[in-house]
């Protein structure tokens, strides 16, 4: 029995509403949890384990993304999406009920599985529902939703923690998630299986070994363990074994998680490389500009966080505009434009100095956001326009996967640049002054020299704490603090120049893209009608 035109439109509206709700709250989760961290540690303890709340989620969510995309192609969108939502909600409830930090970390890892499944699914479903111009428009809208969640997340998190308690940061996902499940389950097409499903178990296992080992090495290297320690070298070795094994397994699998033949497609390879390098720059700016604001300008941690707001607002604007603009100028020109705008923003960041105001710094971040909004949604659109519906899940999730890896790699690589550069600067500028101090200050000088040798970045971060600065003897602070500030500024310049290079490399890869043709208007109108009908006419079972 076929639905009326009004019934189909109603189900599609229901589905899109469910997608928006699910995507908004999964994006919101990361920012509001960060706001609640101090309260969580105050209640559960485990300060030394706090970073694992983020690391556990990162590990599981990043690893599951390509697996979710393949499962969506094999099993259908509805069962995979709804399963991800249910896992996310169940884990959220468990996080709220956690009695200690260890339990919370485990449940955050479980929550990451649900979040990682949800992450690519909205874009996959948009790719199913729409073609051409409509697809571009909705990719832009959903990119804007992600940006909006990043802007208002800290405010919502702060209100929840202050008005209720930190547990409601997790519990709030339950009523909202239930609504999203109902809307998506009712609006999204199911699939009737006609034959056996070949799960690539070996591919899943080798991917988990390779990706988790790599992310752990990048997360802990240079911070918890030295880069040449046996722990980090062992993780890199295990990552190499896992990735090589994954490539071998995937080349022979009947239903590979990430088919190796896709990398022979120039469009697939270069679009994911562009996304990888763009994410290095994006996460570099988000991570290291607050260092400048706190250490040089002297704003508080909460104030430095607001510097992200203009960047996200500008990203929201260009995400929406870009979804329409791409149909006029084309995919390749828009990506090049966005990457060049981002590069311009990074070039401006290299001009930050001791006299830079908060307004100037935020305006530079806003320029980077303009470029991000032009590029991010269009990368997914370009992949979807270049492949068949049968490959939509894999190619869409691959885009999110390589961006996540790029972000993690970028934070680690740029952090290493900052550490190395700051160590050299402090050795050149601060050590000669410490050597000139009188004998009675020898223990103080030795302490600072030890920090320069082992943790120069940590010494510079003492600028973020007024209490730490006050511990420097008054007789020496007038010399030491300016040296620390100029060293921090110069090391951040090196970080921003490195980020600029990565963005420039991404822009160069854009030149190698073949022209990607968007669906023409007449064909698009007909395809829209056919897709909408198929998407909402769900089998009864």
UniProtKB/Swiss-Prot annotation:
Membrane topology, record value: Multi-pass membrane protein
CDD domains assigned to the protein according to its UniProt record, in alphabetical order: MFS_Azr1_MDR_like
Deletion phenotype: Disruption of the gene completely abolishes the multidrug resistance observed in the mdtR mutant.
Compartments, as annotated in UniProt: Cell membrane
UniProtKB keywords: Cell membrane, Membrane, Transmembrane, Transmembrane helix, Transport
One of the record's GO cellular component terms: plasma membrane
GO BP: transmembrane transport
Transmembrane segment boundaries: 14-34, 40-60, 79-99, 112-132, 141-161, 168-188, 201-221, 229-249, 273-293, 307-327, 329-349, 359-379, 401-420, 492-512
InterPro entries, sorted: EmrB-like, MFS, MFS_dom, MFS_trans_sf, Sugar_transporter_CS
Signal peptide: none
Description of what induces expression: Part of the mdtRP (yusOP) operon. Expression is repressed by the HTH-type transcriptional repressor MdtR. Induced by fusidic acid. The mdtRP expression is decreased during stationary phase, even in mdtR mutants.
Main location: membrane
UniProt keyword Cell membrane, yes or no: yes
Any one GO MF annotation of this record: transmembrane transporter activity
Xref: Pfam families: MFS_1 (PF07690)
Function as written in the Swiss-Prot or TrEMBL entry: Multidrug efflux transporter. Contributes to resistance to several antibiotics, including fusidic acid, novobiocin, streptomycin and actinomycin, possibly by pumping these structurally unrelated antibiotics out of cells.
Family stated for the protein in its record: Belongs to the major facilitator superfamily. EmrB family.
Name used for this protein in its record: Multidrug transporter protein MdtP
UniProt source species: Bacillus subtilis (strain 168)
This protein's encoding gene: mdtP
């Amino acid at each position: 029995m076929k639905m009326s035109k009004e019934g189909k439109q109603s189900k599609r509206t229901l589905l899109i509403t469910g997608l928006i709700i699910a995507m908004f709250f999964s994006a919101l989760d990361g920012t509001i949890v960060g706001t609640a961290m101090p309260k969580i540690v105050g209640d559960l303890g485990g300060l030394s384990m706090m970073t694992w709340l983020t690391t556990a989620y990162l590990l599981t969510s990043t690893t599951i993304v390509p697996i979710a995309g393949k499962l969506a192609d094999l099993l259908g969108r509805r069962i995979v999406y709804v399963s991800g939502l249910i896992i996310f909600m169940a884990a959220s409830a468990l996080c709220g009920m956690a009695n200690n930090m260890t339990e919370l970390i485990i449940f955050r890892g479980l929550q990451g599985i649900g979040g990682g499944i949800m992450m690519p699914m909205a874009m996959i479903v948009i790719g199913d529902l729409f073609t051409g111009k409509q697809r571009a428009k909705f990719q832009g809208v959903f990119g804007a939703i992600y940006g909006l969640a990043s802007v208002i997340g800290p405010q919502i998190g702060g209100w929840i923690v202050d008005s209720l308690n930190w547990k409601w940061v997790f519990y709030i996902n339950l009523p909202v998630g239930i609504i999203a499940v109902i809307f998506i389950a009712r609006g999204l097409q199911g699939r009737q299986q006609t034959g056996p499903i070949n799960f690539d178990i070996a591919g899943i296992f080798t991917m988990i070994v390779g990706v988790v080992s790599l992310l752990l090495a990048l997360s802990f290297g240079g911070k918890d363990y030295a880069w040449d320690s046996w722990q980090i070298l062992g993780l890199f070795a295990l990552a190499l074994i896992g990735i090589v094994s994954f490539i071998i397994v995937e080349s022979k699998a009947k239903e590979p998680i990430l088919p190796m033949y896709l990398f022979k497609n120039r469009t697939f390879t270069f679009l994911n490389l562009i996304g990888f390098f763009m994410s290095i720059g994006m996460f570099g700016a988000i991570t290291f500009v607050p260092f400048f604001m706190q250490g040089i300008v002297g704003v508080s941690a909460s104030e430095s966080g607001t510097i992200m707001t203009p960047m996200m607002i500008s990203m929201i604007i260009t995400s929406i505009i870009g979804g329409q603009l791409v149909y006029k100028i084309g995919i390749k020109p828009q990506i090049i434009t966005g990457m060049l705008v981002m590069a311009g923003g990074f070039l401006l960041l290299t001009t930050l100095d001791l006299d830079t105001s908060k307004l100037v710094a935020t305006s530079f971040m806003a320029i980077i956001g303009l470029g991000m909004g032009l590029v991010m949604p269009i990368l997914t659109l370009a992949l979807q326009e270049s492949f068949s519906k049968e490959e939509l899940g894999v190619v869409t999730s691959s885009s999110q996967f390589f961006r996540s890896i790029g972000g993690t790699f970028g934070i680690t690589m740029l952090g290493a640049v900052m550490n190395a550069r700051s160590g050299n600067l402090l050795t050149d500028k601060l050590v000669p002054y410490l050597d000139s101090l009188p004998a009675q200050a020898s223990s103080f000088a030795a302490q600072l020299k030890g920090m320069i040798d082992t943790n120069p970045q940590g010494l510079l971060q003492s600028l973020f704490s007024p209490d730490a600065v006050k511990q420097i003897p008054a007789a020496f602070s007038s010399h030491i603090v300016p040296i620390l500030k100029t060293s921090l500024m110069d090391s951040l310049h090196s970080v921003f120049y490195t980020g600029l290079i990565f963005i420039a490399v991404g822009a160069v890869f854009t030149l190698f893209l073949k022209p990607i043709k968007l669906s023409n208007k007449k064909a698009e109108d007909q395809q829209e009608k056919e897709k909408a009908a198929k998407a909402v006419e769900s089998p009864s079972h």
